Swiss-Prot record:
GO terms for molecular function: succinate dehydrogenase activity. Part of an enzyme complex containing four subunits: a flavoprotein (FrdA), an iron-sulfur protein (FrdB), and two hydrophobic anchor proteins (FrdC and FrdD). It comes from Salmonella choleraesuis (strain SC-B67). InterPro entries: Fumarate_red_D, SQR/QFR_C/D. This is Fumarate reductase subunit D. Its main location: membrane.
Length: 119
């Protein structure tokens, strides 16, 4: 017999954040690392393309704040989701593991939001 009131799972929300963080980490983050870690120190940017004033102006704009927020939060959720499932796969059972890992991700998301807003 089919249960008319099945228990809803919260896993799709966490899988969505995990997937978004994985895509961000695979597509956007390497480009930023390439730009900031390799091309900028080697002087491959024209003039003041990434001067302090321009980067600060971008970071303080709405789009810049959203970008910084996503650059920090999405890989964070991806990593903590991966750690949660890695512990499960290794048979290391963390008491209330879902609360520990996803709670930490939620707390760090709030801290990041406060930091980005006050930037």
């Amino acid at each position: 017999m089919i249960n008319p009131n099945p228990k809803r799972s919260d896993e799709p929300v966490f899988w969505g954040l995990f997937g978004a963080g994985g895509m961000w980490g695979a597509i956007i983050a390497p480009v930023i690392v390439l730009l900031v870690s390799i091309m900028l120190p080697l002087g491959l940017f024209p003039g003041d393309a990434l001067s302090f004033e321009r980067v600060l102006t971008f970071a303080q704009s709405f789009i810049g704040r959203v970008f910084l927020f996503l650059m920090i939060v999405l890989p964070l959720w991806c990593g903590l989701h991966r750690m949660h499932h890695a512990m499960h796969d290794l048979k290391i059972h963390v008491p209330a593991g879902k609360w520990v890992f996803y709670g930490l991700a939620a707390i760090l998301t709030v801290v990041t939001a406060i930091g980005v807003i006050t930037l």
